[in-house]
């Protein structure tokens, strides 16, 4: 979330290397002067110009670069088409014909999970990529994203009216209605499996998931009403470097090495899901298409991979306006006017401070003591969960605790948005030692620490760890400065993702409770409660 990095930057806590998933130059504008210009780097030079243009500032500088793409289009049940003798769509007209043909058999031709903001937003843009990629469209996008613009930029009167007309026609041609606004991803997949739905809007990963279940599926592009074909894409993440690196040539060289690796072919192959196609924006990365995406190879080879406009405003306003169009409340003209008005509206909401930290704590790991900011969070959360001991995987927290006032959203951002869960159990000292060992030494099916910074943070106990042969070994656990008695009983809360906890949860003889509430939600509720306070850090680890 770019708001998170803006908050860090305003309080002197911007990291050297930052990544972001939901991204737009519009939202990144406040960070521009704090980021390195990457325009002259080899990594930027390798990005196809058609895509690099989406990341260029008005002055030609480039602060962010994209890694590989997640492609979105139409996932189709090809077996259903063959069963009813309906040709696969090759353009917009045949897409509409297919929808009508399926309707005669009592099958929905197209639907999607319109309960989500991104589905609303990407449908609006995907149907009009040709218009948005035209000279007029690029001109508007540059103005909307320009960091130098001090005034709000609304929709233009050329490209966007046509986009809403295209969406209005699509809603009519596919029969979308108010009932579709309640559908989530699982609802759509269930209908695909049951033969009740022929096509939905989603990522190429959906083709593999259906194929793994024995369903003959295919992936098709967006069909523009002008005859062109496009894929909607979103980078798995964007990466930027802090301008502070320019003051330290050694750190800058290391950061550039990290950037080089992030954008390498090997790294991008590791980013995509197993079996998913690798679609890169870089000329240095080979195109790798599985059978699932062979139908869209010509689209990819034409560089018809549109990078969505993904500002916070576009997510929220698209959800509101597109939903109202689907529900029949807005015409194309009314939707255009409503969207434009919301883009131009003044920001009147002032978020309330829910948490104040008078001190700042670094997230640098020290062999004698650990990570001060992680200790603050672990100690505070131990109180929140009313537990004797808390063990937190290293990827539980986002970074330094800043000396700043936190709003509810900023406080929530102190917890990693990775589905972190809380698990609780009463156990003996001996069992606690083995639980800590699992976090420190790792396991094949869970998570294994790979450097000092990835060791867990603990609260209510202190641990001794030995670093050897590229790994770590637990050598001691103390509580209140004394060795932990094996028969002492304590309540223990573990913070970890479901995958990290899987090996511990596999032992039915020592069941954990919980795993059904996200730590981020619990922390947000605590911060918003009116009496939130941060605990002091402690020396929780000695690494030898």
Predicted segment positions?
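Extracytoplasmic "Venus flytrap"/periplasmic binding protein-like
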Residues: 1-50, 79-90, 190-191, 198-199, ...
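Hinge/lid segment of periplasmic solute-binding proteins
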Residues: 21-72, 87, 96, 122-123, ...
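Extracytoplasmic/periplasmic solute-binding protein
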Residues: 63-65, 96-152
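Conserved C-terminal helix/tail region of periplasmic/extracytoplasmic solute-binding proteins
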Residues: 82, 297-353
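Extracytoplasmic/periplasmic substrate-recognition and gating elements
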Residues: 84, 211-274
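Glycine-centered hinge/linker elements that transmit conformational signals in sensory
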Residues: 143-181
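Long, aromatic- and glycine/proline-rich binding clefts that accommodate carbohydrate-like moieties
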Residues: 217-220, 270-324
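Catalytic centers of hydrolytic enzymes
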Residues: 351-544
